Amino acid sequence: MHLPDGSVAHAIPQGPLAIFPGSFDPLHDGHRTLAAVVAWKFGRPVHFELSRTNVEKPELSDEVVNTRIEQFRGFAPIWVTQAAIFEAKSALFPGALFVVGFDTALRLLDAKYYADGAHRDASLQAIRERGCRFVVGGRIDSSSVFRTWENPGELFEVLTEADFRFDLSSTELRAKLC
């Protein structure tokens, strides 16, 4: 784990954590605000997680990883893992509350990311058995409608629009920077 002061720790802190996975390309105010809301609402420190591997993207180079880690200096701890899927993340961080956006939560349930529906169900059961849950931040869709889950189920906590709303995605921020 890379700490805000730039040092590195190798042990997972004691007590319940909130883990905020993402690519953080770039880390922006929406990430910071969502982390603050989760820390306040759930009473858990928020650590960020950057996986070198991703089911939809090429593996991150050392240079890219180091650049993304640097964004967290003076802000928050960040873990660098090889855990591309949440079942693997739950093995690394048992008991964690994973902080995800609406689109990531939908992908978590999408059968196309699993061999079949039974594998998806087994993966979600493994996450549940490790005591992990998800907190989901909603988002504004292309019609300017705030989207979040109405019936989240036992694995998910949903933040309302009053809890958290940030209207600019990382993709939109990257497009504005180019």
Question: Which residue ranges define each predicted feature?
Answer:
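Nucleotidyltransferase catalytic core that binds NTPs
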Residues: M1-C178
